[in-house]
Design a protein with these regions (language model features):
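Conserved glycine-bearing catalytic or ligand-binding loops at nucleotide- and phosphate-handling centers
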Residues: 118, 122-130
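Extracytoplasmic/secreted envelope proteins and their assembly/folding machinery
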Residues: 50, 64-69, 99, 111
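Short, conserved sequence motifs used for protein processing/export or organelle targeting and
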Residues: 93-109, 113, 127-242
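Thiol-based oxidoreductase modules, predominantly thioredoxin-like and allied folds used
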Residues: 74-97
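Short, thiol/selenol-centered motifs that function as redox-active sites or metal-ligating centers
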Residues: 53-68, 86-88
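Short, solvent-exposed loop/turn and secondary-structure capping segments
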Residues: 61-65, 125-127, 203
């Protein structure tokens, strides 16, 4: 996986947050990989999904991550960290597949980057607000105005396999059609994100040592057909190695 090449510079300009135009992400229901369970949550109660593009050598990524940690409890946000892997020589925590997904979706290759609910992106670590904490709080509290609920069930069948079942019960499909980036050509998909709670890498030059919320896999479970009366599905999946 490691490719010997130059590492792109980190971004430190005070760039304002902008919309991505590629559609939203919502959800956040989760279970430990070795535990079965079922969760039903109203869309209005779902956490803000925050994707962080980072690297173990990225010193200003630490400022971004600490700001998110500081507001995590108050805002209820959930963090998912994608570690740089393409042309990477210093960070062993990423994968080419996960890094490529982030680049294909958002077009960014240099950390730090923070994306809120898939629809608003903040590049760099310099805020144009009073602080990163206040800027991130405002972005995390934006309401997507989706009405209805989502049910997610996870049933492990071995240490590395399991069955994921999902269903959504939107009160009004118009609320989904009105989401940022959604048009008549858009599709709605269910995914399982496999996340390692914390990964240790003492050699990380930004000094953290322990790196939380590491995304290890993004597995497509199936397309949700909004014209169908059955907005549900099930899939057998294999977990990626930690």
């Amino acid at each position: 996986i490691l490719i010997l090449t130059a590492i792109g510079p980190t971004l430190s300009v005070a760039a304002p947050a902008t919309t991505t135009g590629v559609g939203v992400l919502f959800g956040g229901q989760s279970f430990e990989a070795n535990q079965s369970g079922t969760s039903t949550v109203n869309f209005s109660e779902m956490p803000s999904i925050v994707e962080v593009y980072t690297a173990t050598w990225c010193s200003n990524c630490v400022d971004v991550e600490h700001a998110l940690d500081y507001i995590e409890n108050d805002t209820g946000l959930q963090q998912y960290h994608t570690h740089r892997a393409i042309n990477e020589v210093q960070d062993p925590l990423g994968s080419i597949e996960i890094d490529q997904r982030f680049h294909d979706r958002y077009g960014i290759k240099a950390p730090p980057v923070v994306v809120f609910n898939g629809s608003v992106i903040k590049v760099g670590s310099v805020t144009d607000a009073d602080s990163l904490e206040s800027e991130f709080t405002e972005l995390a509290q934006q309401n997507m105005n989706i009405s209805g609920s989502s049910t997610f069930t996870w049933n492990p069948t071995s240490n590395s396999t399991g069955t994921a079942t999902w269903a959504i019960q939107p009160v009004d499909l118009t609320s989904i059609h009105d989401l940022d980036g959604y048009d008549e050509k858009s599709s709605l998909f269910a995914y399982a994100w496999i996340v390692e709670q914390s990964a240790s890498f003492e050699e990380g030059s930004n000094g953290l040592g322990d790196y939380p919320h590491v995304v290890r896999g993004v597995i497509e479970l199936g397309e949700i057909n909004l014209t169908s009366n059955d907005l549900s599905g099930s899939a057998n999946i294999t977990l990626p190695p930690a």
